[in-house]
Amino acid sequence: MSRLKIPSQLLRGGRGFSVLSRPAANYAGHVPLTPVERCTMAVGSAIGSLLNPRRHDLIATLGETTATPYFIYRLRDAMLSDPTGRRILRDRPRITSQTLSLPYLRSLPPTSLGATFASWLDREGVSPDTRSRVRYIDDEECAYVMQRYRECHDFYHAVTGLPIVVEGELALKIFEYMNTGLPMTGLSAAAVVRLKGAERQRFWDVYLPWAVRSGAGSKELICVYWEELLERDVGELRAELGIEVPPDMREMRRRHRKQKQQEKQEK
């Protein structure tokens, strides 16, 4: 009779591990968790982020606590099987305002990836420095993979044109789920209950079909070395990566508001 093999991670998590005797960190900022702690934090952060989708700290915690033991390894293996992905793992670049010169990006041709990225940051009023550090993934290399995914998120926004409203984040998270398979991105679909009537209808009719189709049909975006493509034409790059541009969400929201105002005036 064959014996059941229990993963060593679970065996280590079940003995000699308490709040007072926590194992040494595997990298700077690492916080080892027991299976019970991981499960508790996953549930708590899922509920908290659903109640308040703007709590990016809870969304980050949900992403880390649900990424193991399988999903982040699958994403790491996808990088290892790709020449560019392997270079990224070797170089370990970071995407911050220190590693990317925003003034330079703004000086690039308007149709370039760099100018598109800088324009999106300026329009949304955000910075590439807002991504928190990974803490709850035990494997140091996989922690970098999660950090890389997190810091590339704004590039996904820029090439799709989706804004950072709840409706836009939800559409992009489904796109990411179809592309990366990370559970947190799929669990974000629960936030559809936070959308208003017109937003919810747009999501079901327009942005969910787009996210499923484009996310599944595009290249593994975790293997894209965005920093080396900043001068590329963004339209050509989208075609190369298989990214379909969704209908302009800001324009659709603007037209809906204008229509509602006209209806009020006619009453």
Curated annotation (Swiss-Prot):
Keywords associated with the record: Lyase, Membrane, Metal-binding, Mitochondrion, Mitochondrion inner membrane, Transit peptide, Ubiquinone biosynthesis, Zinc
Pathway assigned to this chain's UniProt record: Cofactor biosynthesis; ubiquinone biosynthesis
InterPro entries for the chain: Coq4, Coq4_euk
Transit peptide: 1-17
Enzyme Commission number: 4.1.1.130
Enzyme's top EC category: lyase
Membrane topology annotation: Peripheral membrane protein
GO biological process, one term: ubiquinone biosynthetic process
GO cellular component: extrinsic component of mitochondrial inner membrane
Residues annotated as binding Zn(2+): H153, D154, H157, E169
Location in the cell: Mitochondrion inner membrane
Record field: catalytic activity: a 4-hydroxy-3-methoxy-5-(all-trans-polyprenyl)benzoate + H(+) = a 2-methoxy-6-(all-trans-polyprenyl)phenol + CO2
Cofactor entry: Zn(2+)
Quaternary organization: Component of a multi-subunit COQ enzyme complex, composed of at least COQ3, COQ4, COQ5, COQ6, COQ7 and COQ9.
Similarity field: Belongs to the COQ4 family.
Main function: Lyase that catalyzes the C1-decarboxylation of 4-hydroxy-3-methoxy-5-(all-trans-polyprenyl)benzoic acid into 2-methoxy-6-(all-trans-polyprenyl)phenol during ubiquinone biosynthesis.
Protein name per Swiss-Prot or TrEMBL: Ubiquinone biosynthesis protein COQ4, mitochondrial
Species of the source: Arthroderma otae (strain ATCC MYA-4605 / CBS 113480) (Microsporum canis)
